[in-house]
């Protein structure tokens, strides 16, 4: 079980695409991102409590077993590899051109993510729920849906116990041991 406390924090991450490009406009790329997050989750053994994938960024809350920099490295590294591989395999050259970054030693490489991702340490259940609600309201604020349950690439349904048969990403909310009532 996971207790949220100062000694055992969670982390709230926001990763933004390079130049805020709307890379995740299509369901296919959101699905690839969910699969990549799931892969990172398993390989790094992190717990994921909430998420949303927006057109140009994602928010996610994880446990604090690893250092935040390592969690972010796993999440952003695996998602970048999977998304860029998909774009290459399907000849999305104009999208790849927008993600090119020049490196002196190696020439061009691709950079999916901005290099200043936002990390926030969560040390209380009330702060945790504030971030969960913020994440779930994101698609409404962006006018992508009218009801948070209608946005497929979010954990909102899971938190409301309205799971779909094939949720895009598994959550670990059952592993939270709540202290406050």
Annotate each predicted stretch with a short phrase.
Residues 1-181:
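Short catalytic/metal-binding and nucleic-acid-binding patches
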């Amino acid at each position: 079980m996971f207790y949220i406390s100062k000694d055992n924090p969670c982390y709230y991450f926001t990763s933004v695409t390079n130049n805020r490009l709307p890379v995740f406009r299509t369901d296919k790329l959101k699905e690839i991102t969910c699969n990549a997050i799931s892969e990172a989750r398993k390989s790094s053994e992190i717990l994921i409590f909430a998420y949303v994938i927006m057109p140009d960024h994602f928010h996610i809350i994880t446990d604090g077993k690893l250092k935040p920099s390592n969690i972010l490295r796993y999440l952003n590294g695996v998602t970048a590899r999977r998304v860029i591989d998909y774009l290459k395999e399907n000849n999305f050259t104009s999208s790849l051109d927008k993600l090119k970054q020049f490196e002196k030693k190696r020439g061009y490489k691709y950079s999916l993510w901005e290099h200043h991702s936002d990390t926030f340490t969560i040390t209380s259940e009330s702060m945790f729920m504030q971030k969960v609600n913020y994440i779930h309201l994101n698609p409404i604020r962006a006018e992508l849906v009218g009801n948070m349950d209608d946005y497929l690439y979010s954990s909102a349904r899971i938190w409301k116990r309205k799971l779909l048969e094939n949720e895009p990403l598994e959550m670990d909310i059952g592993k939270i041991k709540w202290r406050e009532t």
